[in-house]
């Protein structure tokens, strides 16, 4: 695989993931041609991809931290050391032996302390290059054809207000647009997925496609109201959860009622509470809870529950050794389970957990 091909693959993955997660959109389908069902064009796809064109692509593992994030106390100590060093250096120029020797030694000591302080400062990664790469529309998605139109970062043209300004747009502009009141999808997509967690199905049945291939919401006015409530609450998820679970709809019995069996056999209109399957992690958690083994400790490292010996022997790129967690920590909630992408823990695989090769909003359970 050529480096340029990797760049195209990474860009396409970012477009697919970002558009699906936040917009419930299949913008990734417009990589090689205009979208067949929704009004996304190839130009929309590559303009969206251009938001990520200033990310440094190492291609050889995680880069080292390159941005210091000192605490207030560390900043204060560093400033004090710098001031003392500069003061001593000015005195060295006028001093004579043996005082000069003592001053030089003191400067060396303070400099060593300063270096130690710098090593104690936490670092984060600023994966932004100085010069964004040129982004072109690739005919049929062919990375070898560099004759296409050069595009700048931008959002899909049909989605209302443009972000055009007298400068190159950044990912911060994209983020602000995604959570703005003007955005037609983000809040609706979010509350629809939250609704599914408590009612078994979304107000719109397809969680990862809000286009023509998705499902029309059964209660569009309710979906709009919840979306506005989410925005006006300051995107307060706890508020939305509370709102849903104290509703009369949520507190209904899941037992079928004679009067609704014929009018709403599939519970499409939420005439009763749903009975729905739970995810693989929750099946494990429930089994551990029933046996009295579940550890409810919050936080900490990921865990590696028992799995058959040699299970990883078929895993390539690179070979890995699985070391089962010891003690009660292996019984922590499924939230903390180690995930080996494309090679799931057997228990997760048995109950249809996703492989995480691609972003999934709705599991096939």
Model-derived regions, located:
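Sequence context surrounding c-type heme c attachment/ligation sites in exported
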Residues: 1-79, 348
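Primarily short, surface-exposed interaction patches in extracytoplasmic proteins
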Residues: 8-11, 39, 76-329, 348, ...
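Generic recognition of well-ordered alpha-helical segments
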Residues: 17, 24, 28, 47-54, ...
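Extracytoplasmic/periplasmic beta-strand context in beta-sandwich domains
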Residues: 44-46, 268, 333
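A broadly conserved detector of short glycine/acidic/proline-rich loop/turn motifs that flank catalytic sites
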Residues: 52, 141, 294, 339-341
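Hydrophobic alpha-helical segments
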Residues: 55-58, 342, 354
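Active-site Gly/Thr loop motif
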Residues: 333, 340-352
